[in-house]
């Protein structure tokens, strides 16, 4: 391939991937189906269900046009191939053009089928029909969802391509091409998986992501999974009427403090150990009185007379967990990215120390 072809192909590939799996930069620039077609889609707050009936259809059509857009761009990037004249183009490109034209035609056919009889055949409308009373239709269920979505007390989280919304009556997951819906009174929720991620875009602390299986007892409904940060788990439980069960061996760390304590302990473990004199007996931790003292503050971050940290002369009096809780209690909750690098006073003598000065007792 010539250089213009390679350049255009790589650039278009990046654009297509970002347009389908939209990053924050594309949202900020307004390069989304929701923003480009906002005049036709209407307002999500005003009419949640009609908005997503149109949005899912428009998204399917726009994404199906991407191969055709690539072909049209290659007409200029590789003009010597005469792609603008399909009859003279190479056979491989003729097949690609056939595929590029077929995809939008199939999408239009499917969208027309969905929209027939006021969107009754759309997957979202068919799901809502499962919850409709015998004397009413799916539109009555849609009206209920529209009303509850407008309330400010709903729970909403997640990226635009995988949003989780919980209202007083409904549990919903909004994805690129579908909207999953379940009625709260009929669902069983189970935490099936928890994953720890060491990197967070907002702080130096690890992030735990939970996967919750939402299974409805209503006939004909399909279960779906929702994912959220463990720090939002408590807020989700407050909005749900049904309890959430946990699968075996799934540990949920709900608070920022829980995540920090784990990170604090992992950092302390790699610090130099402190050897207790043979004639000194370790006493119970004065913080919890449940375990023996297990840490000693020893200035190891810098030379004794250098820096802000000070030497602590207290004997081992605290366990690792209580020292971590003390360290966290002295931090700004709005600035978790500064916690690990900060300095706090010793809880006993007030000598300032950092995390590098906390040594495990051996």
UniProtKB/Swiss-Prot annotation:
Zn-finger (RING-type) residues: 285-350
GO cellular component, one term: endoplasmic reticulum membrane
Cytoplasmic side: 28-56, 116-362
Enzyme class: transferase
Stretches of the chain found on the membrane's Lumenal side: 1-6, 78-94
Pathway note: Protein modification; protein ubiquitination
Membrane topology: Multi-pass membrane protein
Pfam families referenced in this protein's UniProt entry, alphabetically: Tmpp129
UniProt keyword annotations, A-Z: Endoplasmic reticulum, Membrane, Metal-binding, Transferase, Transmembrane, Transmembrane helix, Ubl conjugation pathway, Unfolded protein response, Zinc, Zinc-finger
Disulfide bonds: none
GO biological process terms held by the UniProt record: protein polyubiquitination; response to unfolded protein; retrograde protein transport, ER to cytosol; ubiquitin-dependent protein catabolic process
Entry's family note: Belongs to the TMEM129 family.
Job of this protein: E3 ubiquitin-protein ligase involved in ER-associated protein degradation, preferentially associates with the E2 enzyme UBE2J2. Exploited by viral US11 proteins to mediate HLA class I proteins degradation.
Subunit structure and binding partners: Integral component of ER-resident dislocation complexes.
Stated name of the protein: E3 ubiquitin-protein ligase TM129
Provenance organism: Mus musculus (Mouse)
Higher taxonomy: Eukaryota, Metazoa, Chordata, Craniata, Vertebrata
